[in-house]
Amino acid sequence: GLTRPSKRCLAGSAPCEFHRGYTCCSGHCLIWVCA
């Protein structure tokens, strides 16, 4: 239940700023949760 990786991000940082509900996983923004 993941979308394709989006904007780059830092692991352990706040949720991705460009959209709510995104989480940082493996250096990329993923919707909702990590796989």
UniProtKB/Swiss-Prot annotation:
Probable neurotoxin with unknown target. Possibly targets ion channels. Belongs to the conotoxin O1 superfamily. Its main location: secreted. One of its GO terms (molecular function) is ion channel regulator activity. Expressed by the venom duct. The keyword Nucleotide-binding does not apply. Residues 1-8 form a propeptide. It comes from the Eukaryota. Disulfide bonds join 9-25, 16-29, 24-34. One of its GO terms (cellular component) is extracellular region. The keyword Calcium does not apply. It comes from Californiconus californicus (California cone). It is found in: Secreted. The presence of a 'disulfide through disulfide knot' structurally defines this protein as a knottin. The cysteine framework is VI/VII (C-C-CC-C-C). This is Conotoxin Cal6.1d. Keywords: Cleavage on pair of basic residues, Disulfide bond, Ion channel impairing toxin, Knottin, Neurotoxin, Secreted, Toxin.
